[in-house]
Amino acid sequence: YEAGLANTIEETIENQKHTGSNQIYNKAGIPQSKAGIVPWMFIDWTHAKANAESMYKKDYLSSGLITGTQWDVMLKKMIGKTIGENKSILTESNLVDSTDWGNYMNNSIHYVGRLAKCDYNSTNSNVWTLKSFGTKTTGTTNNYSSNNGDLLTTGASKTAQVYHIYDAAGNLWEWTEEISYNTTGEEYRMCRSGGFLSNTNKYSTCFRDGGGRIEKTGVGTGFRAVLYIK
């Protein structure tokens, strides 16, 4: 699953309301990795890495932020596996165009869980308002032609499940350990997956996005933790 908000943070947000302030979410905490949790967005790379590593610190088990190589291996393992409710077989073309199995702005997928709508603020190109997550329901996400979208709780859509992995395509962009550099040599970190405010024609699960500075936060960016058995 994508990393879900820590219990302590979820409990302090009245009715799961999201104001768009990264101060609510951009902090330390132990992520939840299970279905039905509000995904941890508005978090920068530094906190995402530290929080992913905080899940398990034992002699025989540890955790961390997913690497770019691990992401690529995960996608390769998915080829030939069944795509959730669609019952079709995932091919390499599904990695280039993830429309059929990811939660993106310009498609509709079936879900059983909670959903929050994100509305673009036309007066400020950097502002989106994320409305409250409702109660658990069944339905399909909306197909938008502009920068609006429906964000789902973790594991809400079986359509978005391949090889027992949820939301590798869409829902939230996910920080990785992979490094990139901008034209001035400043260190960035790569994001993968595409998100609920992304267009599937441009931002599929195999797409590498430069991400941004390690202190960048956004309504469409979260992370995923991986486990290491020693």
Explain the meaning of each model-derived region.
Residues 170-178:
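Active-site-proximal beta-strands of protease catalytic cores
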Residues 1-4, 68, 174, 220-224:
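Residue-level signal for functionally critical sites in structured catalytic/ligand-binding pockets
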Residues 3-6, 70, 79, 177-182, ...:
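Acidic glycine-/aspartate-rich tracts in secreted/extracellular proteins
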Residues 1-168:
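Short aromatic-cysteine micro-motif
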Residues 39-46, 50, 62, 66, ...:
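Disulfide-stabilized, aromatic/cysteine-rich ligand-recognition loop
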